[in-house]
Amino acid sequence: MASYGFPLTASSLVDWTSLTFSPIEVNGHIQCTYSPEVAEWGAPHFVKDPYLRVHGLAPALNYGQQIFEGMKAFRTPTGSIRLFRPKMNAVRFAHSASFVAIPPVPEALFLRAVHLAVGLNSEFVPPYDSRGSALYIRPIAFASSATANLAPADHFTFCVFVMPVAPLSTGAGQGLRALVVEDVDRAAPKGTGSAKVGGNYAPIVTTMQRAKADGYGLTLHLDSATHTMVDEFSASGFIGVRVDAGKTTMVVPDSPTILRSITVDSMCRIAESFGWQVQRRAVSFTELAELSEAFAVGTAFILTPVRAITRPCTHTCIEYTADYRSSASAYTRLLETLQGIQQGWLDDAWGWTEEVQDPSSDEFITDTVQARR
């Protein structure tokens, strides 16, 4: 069994001060296949080539039969590497698979693949002192059979890719401006909104680009049935905080058409530990004017403050004047607690983190054949 010197220290070949959210070359990824002959997912393979060889008529490419996840690994003060609530990602991955006829990846295999992907790329986990940076983990699964017919696929592929990243956006200090999307709905009332499938994201890219050109860093979706209730941002969840007479209340939209965000759930638990009231319920757009602070929340965005929310059709602009830099702000308290738990400088009272296992203790297959380009 090979020894990998796990965990390796952060690579000196990476400029850790200049990370973005764009991929850089790492050692490889984990890949598993599902075939009808055995009717189960096969053993993990470590593949050094980031490219996949996929038939052009694969249902994933033609009909969108694919799912994905987003999670992170962090380096702690002692040098160990931690995952944050990975079992919740495994559960959500299976939930997404159920929407698009992909065989669910068993939780044990999902976690094993994630541990291997991180462990075999441990030198790409950012150093502990690069606060906010992490090793981003992207599990994907897709139908890889060759068929032109809209029919059940029989071959599937499951992969786990990794890359070191900085926060996607911090909106530090003043926060980001958000635009309410009015020309396209994110998800139908009985659609796939609660699943991480590409079809929930690709249709909004053009709108996001236009919004960015107009100075908006976020796009916010209302419910598709009435366009009166808050759902979520295009790529992150929504959280609002209201302070009345010294009493702090966190408000979180609750709808079957939004993604069950692991970061949002964590923020709710942290808020409750502060003694704040947490309300998961339907949130009307008009209620946003009553909030003291608002955030975009997710694995990539972490916790990003919102400065203003604009809705063109009603000529409404709701502004938030909170000093997000203040140590007393809800934003600062929530963010520092979450990052402290993730990176090991605060006690993990909830048992959310999981130390990455040494890949030397696992038996997996290393593929040396590269994909065709």
Swiss-Prot record:
The keyword Transcription regulation does not apply. The gene is AMT5-2. Gene clusters encoding host-selective toxins (HSTs) are localized on conditionally dispensable chromosomes (CDCs), also called supernumerary chromosomes, where they are present in multiple copies. The CDCs are not essential for saprophytic growth but controls host-selective pathogenicity. The modification N6-(pyridoxal phosphate)lysine is found at K196. Its EC number is 2.6.1.-. Coiled coil: none annotated. One of its GO terms (biological process) is branched-chain amino acid metabolic process. Keywords: Aminotransferase, Pyridoxal phosphate, Transferase, Virulence. Belongs to the class-IV pyridoxal-phosphate-dependent aminotransferase family. Pyridoxal 5'-phosphate binds at R92, E232. One of its GO terms (molecular function) is branched-chain-amino-acid transaminase activity. This is Transaminase AMT5-2. Pathway: Mycotoxin biosynthesis. Its cofactor is pyridoxal 5'-phosphate. The keyword Nuclease does not apply. The lineage of its organism: Eukaryota, Fungi, Dikarya, Ascomycota, Pezizomycotina. Transaminase; part of the gene clusters that mediate the biosynthesis of AM-toxins, host-selective toxins (HSTs) causing Alternaria blotch on apple, a worldwide distributed disease. AM-toxins are cyclic depsipeptides containing the 3 residues 2-hydroxy-isovaleric acid (2-HIV), dehydroalanine, L-alanine which are common for all 3 AM-toxins I to III. The fourth precursor is L-alpha-amino-methoxyphenyl-valeric acid (L-Amv) for AM-toxin I, L-alpha-amino-phenyl-valeric acid (L-Apv) for AM-toxin II, and L-alpha-amino-hydroxyphenyl-valeric acid (L-Ahv) for AM-toxin III. It comes from Alternaria alternata. It holds the Pfam family Aminotran_4.
